[in-house]
């Protein structure tokens, strides 16, 4: 049984999306809200520097799946080469299980086995550990060579829940 802090009243729709300009704008807005609510180690200037990379990644990542609840975008996950490249959930829906649903889709339907997590984001590292991921390497910089250390994680224990 899954435990969610908040009750989910209506079914969730999870599907791959067509990347229209409108869709990219909606995904970017969710990313912006989620990052500001969860990545407290980033200064405003850091977030501003990431914006062009985020827009590019949303358009170019191999597979992009969204979760909608009651018609509202509540989260998305981007995957490429068996790796989760991005997973963001609306702060209004933190703790509701949407991140887990998206991660399960990534593992089960897209064969994802890897993810990088910021060291300064222990909630994300704990989330992936609960799903069976383990750290196999540490990098002192992120993908843009910024001084934000990363934990490189691999799925090593796949439980029945995922």
Would you name each region that the model predicts?
Residues 116-118, 134-151:
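Conserved catalytic-core motifs of GNAT/GCN5-like acyltransferases
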Residues 95-108, 126, 130:
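Conserved acetyl-CoA-binding loop-helix of GNAT-fold acetyltransferases
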Residues 83-94, 118:
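A short, internal acetyl-CoA/4′-phosphopantetheine-binding micro-motif in the GNAT/acyltransferase core
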Residues 22-24, 29-55:
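Conserved GNAT-fold acetyl-CoA-binding loop/helix
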Residues 1-22, 159-162:
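Conserved N-terminal entry element of GNAT/NAT acetyltransferase domains
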Residues 108-120:
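Conserved GNAT acetyl-CoA-binding A-motif
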Residues 55-65, 83:
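A short helix-loop-beta-strand connector motif used in the catalytic cores of GNAT acetyltransferases and
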Residues 62-75:
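Conserved beta-hairpin
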């Amino acid at each position: 049984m899954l435990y969610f802090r908040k009750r989910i009243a209506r079914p969730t729709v999870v599907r791959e999306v067509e990347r229209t300009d409108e869709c990219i704008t909606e995904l970017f807005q969710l990313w912006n809200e989620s990052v500001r609510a969860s990545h407290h180690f980033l200064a405003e200037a850091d977030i501003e520097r990431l914006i062009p990379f985020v827009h590019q990644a949303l358009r170019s990542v191999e597979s992009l799946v969204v979760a909608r609840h009651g018609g509202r975008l509540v989260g998305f996950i981007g995957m490429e080469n068996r790796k989760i490249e991005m997973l963001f959930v609306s702060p209004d829906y933190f703790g509701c299980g949407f991140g887990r649903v998206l991660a399960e889709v990534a593992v089960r339907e897209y064969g994802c086995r890897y993810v990088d997590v910021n060291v300064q984001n222990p909630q994300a590292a704990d989330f992936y550990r609960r799903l069976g991921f383990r750290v196999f390497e540490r990098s002192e910089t992120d993908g843009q060579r910024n001084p934000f250390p990363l934990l490189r994680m691999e799925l090593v224990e796949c439980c029945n829940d995922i």
